[in-house]
């Protein structure tokens, strides 16, 4: 438990959410429920498809299935509570629950940073060293990179969470957000937040810069290798292979850097809520679309699954997304 002003024990916070207008509540609930269900349906479908089709048992799709799992956990750390708060008057969250929510949300996000870097290295190995690909990207190495991503992500998240939630907080303990994100929680602190801001910035820089450097170096080598390909068809195929990953990287890192790698004086809680919706709810639902829309192997795997079980064609929106 944290200590508030006058040595009172802080046991809970109140999440103000996005809007108090009754008409907006219904619209927001339907919108975010739809996004959450689509995220679950599309990512679970992608995981199941990769597991069922032996042609997709490759490092690239091993990483992709882990990314889908991460996105499910990532959005589930905030969406259920947010949906519950929209339709009920009980918008409180315990101090421990708030800290846990931020720890899981931050841990999943930082883990995704490392995983996207691992996926960039995988693309580098596949395009720049195709003959040595199975040697460079072995199953053991894939497991080590995924485990390392989780360890690095959640260790970094623990450091951030501890530095933030050790503060004294001022009443009335109202968080102007729909989940326990960093800026609105720090805004309630009665004590100096400089150290926490420095710690958070350092963690964000280390994780962000390291993972971005891996991505940039990998794609630097990829571009150098692709321009040497004499066939225009070969160049197009190589670039299209990387386009989906680059799109996902740009969306994720761009929104993350905007939120967490800037001075606290530039925070605008109302504006940041909109940005938070994008990286907390929208990115997890568009990732499977980005990776599947132009992926022939996933489309072929889906067609085979539909041929084996025609009932799959009525199984959800993922079918139309992959084959449309």
Swiss-Prot record:
The keyword Ion transport does not apply. Glycans are attached at residue 6. GO terms for cellular component: plasma membrane. InterPro entries: GPCR_Rhodpsn, GPCR_Rhodpsn_7TM, Olfact_rcpt, Olfactory_GPCR. Residues 1-26, 77-100, 156-197, 260-272 are extracellular. Keywords: Cell membrane, Disulfide bond, G-protein coupled receptor, Glycoprotein, Membrane, Olfaction, Receptor, Sensory transduction, Transducer, Transmembrane, Transmembrane helix. Residues 48-55, 122-134, 219-238, 294-324 are cytoplasmic. Pfam families: 7tm_4. SUPFAM superfamilies: Family A G protein-coupled receptor-like. The chain crosses the membrane at residues 27-47, 56-76, 101-121, 135-155, 198-218, 239-259, 273-293. GO terms for molecular function: G protein-coupled receptor activity; odorant binding; olfactory receptor activity. It is a multi-pass membrane protein. It is found in: Cell membrane. Its main location: membrane. The keyword Methyltransferase does not apply. Disulfide bonds join 98-190. It comes from the Eukaryota. Belongs to the G-protein coupled receptor 1 family. Odorant receptor. This is Olfactory receptor 5A2. It comes from Homo sapiens. The gene is OR5A2.
């Amino acid at each position: 438990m944290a200590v508030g002003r006058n040595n009172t024990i802080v046991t809970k916070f109140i999440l103000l959410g996005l809007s108090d207008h009754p008409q907006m509540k219904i619209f927001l609930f339907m919108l975010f429920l739809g996004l959450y269900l689509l995220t679950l349906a599309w990512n679970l479908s992608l995981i199941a498809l990769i597991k069922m089709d032996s042609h997709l048992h490759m490092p690239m799709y091993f990483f992709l299935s882990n990314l889908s799992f991460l996105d499910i956990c990532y959005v589930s750390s905030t969406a259920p509570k947010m949906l519950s708060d929209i339709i009920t008057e009980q918008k409180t969250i315990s101090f421990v629950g708030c800290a846990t929510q931020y720890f899981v949300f931050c841990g999943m996000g930082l883990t995704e940073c490392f995983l996207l870097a691992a996926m960039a290295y995988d693309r580098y190995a596949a395009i720049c060293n195709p003959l040595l690909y199975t040697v460079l990207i072995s199953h053991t190495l894939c497991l080590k990179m995924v485990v390392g991503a989780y360890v690095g992500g959640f260790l970094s998240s623990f450091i951030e969470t501890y530095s933030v939630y050790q503060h004294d907080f001022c009443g009335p303990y109202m968080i102007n957000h729909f989940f326990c994100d960093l800026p609105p929680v720090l805004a309630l602190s009665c004590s100096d937040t400089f150290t926490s801001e420095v710690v958070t910035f350092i963690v964000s820089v280390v994780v962000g810069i390291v993972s971005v450097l891996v991505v940039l170096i990998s794609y630097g080598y990829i571009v150098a290798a692709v321009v040497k390909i004499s066939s225009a068809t070969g160049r197009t195929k190589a670039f299209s292979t990387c386009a989906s990953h680059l799109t996902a990287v740009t969306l994720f890192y761009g929104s993350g850097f905007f939120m967490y790698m800037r001075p606290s004086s530039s925070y605008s809680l109302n504006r940041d809520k909109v940005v938070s919706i994008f990286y907390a709810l929208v990115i997890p639902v568009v990732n499977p679309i980005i990776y599947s829309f132009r992926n022939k192997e996933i489309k072929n795997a889906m067609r085979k699954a539909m041929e084996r079980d025609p009932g799959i064609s009525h199984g959800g929106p993922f079918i139309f997304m992959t084959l449309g």
